[in-house]
Amino acid sequence: MPELPEVETSRLGITPHLQGQTIKAIVVRTDKLRWPIPQELQKLVGQRVQSIRRRAKYLMIDTPKGSAIIHLGMSGSLRVLDEEVPSAKHDHVDLVLENGKVLRYNDPRKFGAWLYSEVGVAHQVLSKLGPEPLTNEFNSEYFAEKAKNKKTVVKQFIMNNAVVVGVGNIYASESLFMAQIHPKTSVGSLKASQITLLVAEIKKVLETAIKQGGTTLKDFNQVDGKPGYFAQELHVYGRAKKKCLLCSSIIQEEKIGQRNTFWCGHCQPFNK
């Protein structure tokens, strides 16, 4: 599943091709993805793209008339192609530009979304979201206040979009490993020093992943078709039964909140 670094990589990749260009057409080949694709998207035809923003794992293509909101779901991807390139299987939406380029959305599982938002109106999917992890708003003081007296396990806590957005399964496991915190630790029991370290590691892991172009496991490739290289940096995720790169202990795996979770029992001891 594309997570924050993959979505940010997509944003960085499409921005030079879209910003300042005029939308000539929006071609919808599948009328429903995760939700029905709204007819209001056609209001963007003839509009100039002002900016491409990201909020959590949503991309917003902004025009003076309104915005297209895109979520990549489990297997979605965006490619910038020449308009004459024929569509392929699972190519569900084209945003056609007057410069002869097309932003093409491919999604085999159809769990993604294309939505529409009027200017100045916050779409409901963007409400109740926590701060962006790479902003100053997400800091140890904020984390400590949110975690106070909570019995939730720390991995589920940092994956809660109401607490902080964009810390998906891969990066939650990696951040906890780097902070040497067991994923099943009660978040309310964390010491101030652990919180400070965890916040710093979340930021560092995400920043590194963005620089590497995200993580390619099954479905994600960059806009230019190249893989993301953060998979080469993974310490625990997807490495069950392999040796820890730091201490040579065996990496453990267990489902936490229905998500596969990985950790090193030596580097991340579980203190009940």
UniProtKB/Swiss-Prot annotation:
NCBIfam families membership: fpg (TIGR00577), PRK01103.1 (NF002211)
Ranges annotated as FPG-type zinc finger: 235-269
Binding site for DNA: H90, R109, K150
Protein's name in the database: Formamidopyrimidine-DNA glycosylase
The EC number(s) this enzyme carries: 3.2.2.23, 4.2.99.18
Native species: Aliivibrio fischeri (strain ATCC 700601 / ES114)
GO molecular function, one term: class I DNA-(apurinic or apyrimidinic site) endonuclease activity
InterPro entries: DNA_glyclase/AP_lyase_DNA-bd, DNA_glyclase_Znf_dom_DNA_BS, Formamido-pyr_DNA_Glyclase, FPG_cat, MutM-like_N-ter, Ribosomal_uS13-like_H2TH, Znf_DNA_glyclase/AP_lyase, Znf_FPG/IleRS
